[in-house]
Amino acid sequence: MSAENSEVSNNGIVIIGAGLAGWHVIDAIRAKDKDIPITLITADSGDRYHKPMLTMAISQKKSAADLVRATGVDAAEAANIKLLANTQVTDVDASTQQLQLISALRSDPVYTNYATIGYDKLVLAMGAHPIFPKSLPEDLVWHVNHIERFGQLQEKLATGSQHVAIVGAGMVGTEIAEDLLKAGHQVTLIDLNDAPLSQMLPPKATSRIAQAVNSQGINFLGGYQVSAITRISDGKLQVSYEALASATDSSTAEPIEPLMVDHVIASTGLTVDDKLPTAAGVDFDRRTGIVVDAPTLRTSTANIYAIGDCMSINGVACRYVAPLRAQAATIADDILGHEHNGYEHKPPMIRLKNKAISVMVTGVPQAVGNWQVKTESEDELVMDLLGDNDAVSATVTIKAPAVPKG
């Protein structure tokens, strides 16, 4: 496949976002070109760390500093790039290929001046940010989508056993629940659905996950929604919740006693900020993110690419780590003018990182569909999701953990 344009002037390549996606692009470009100018812009320090470790680190007694593989400054020096840390992009002018910047420290009057920077090729690697429903005030709840917030929560939890409520029993929420339990905390996991992972798997599969979660000692509240969170006089949080209207007759339902907890973690999904994509004029889907051309990862605007959590391919958000290396290699080849075969998106294997139960999913799962049992026993369940012409579009394999030999 031919590259878009091999001409890159002194402005060089600008990457917005210093998460796994942004650094993967830098690694891929530097593997092919040691000298082309690269500028990395990030609202934080740009430190390199492996985000999936955040859901496993508290039980391992790892602090945020322990998870950092290289500081942003050291990584930038090693990669021969310019790092603009603690810097936010406020506007993209695609016609002039200019970005407007302001310091992320602008609460200090010293840092209120705007600056501009030009680009020849722009890579949007800005990720996605947590969704906070109205019932989950951002100033009262935590999220673990970023190492800085994780570090703040880890410091609070390191003082002793506490009661933590987690709202949302998807992959991340379910993993965090087990990690906190292993660390000695009391855990309540709340979800709108009757079982964890219900948005991607059928009830026959998720019921096994719910059983495993409960058997550990996690208090799973399925079929409930949080209605309010308030801080009370002793510093604890009062979590009010109610059964979903579809799950009970509200005329006969008895009031539910609120939970009293020390912390609340929101694990209620991710969304992509549309401000920069809109300014750049790129096609954008409010549900899935920046729309890209699958073989090249180019957006609809010339000289702009997207990668990672902020992008979508064929209407599907790409929010897994496994494909990042191949995506970055494609962008590197395309930017540098190298012939390449084009990126071929393959759904990654999804694995729940819980010890209480093994859950592995391949393909593109969805909760509702023609799921057929392939293998079923007390210790194992294998189901296939059949699509048109009975083609297998997804497979879930659930296994009970191996019993240690005594």
State where each predicted segment sits.
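Residue-level detector of alpha-helix initiation sites
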Residues: G19-W23, S45, A128-P130, E148, ...
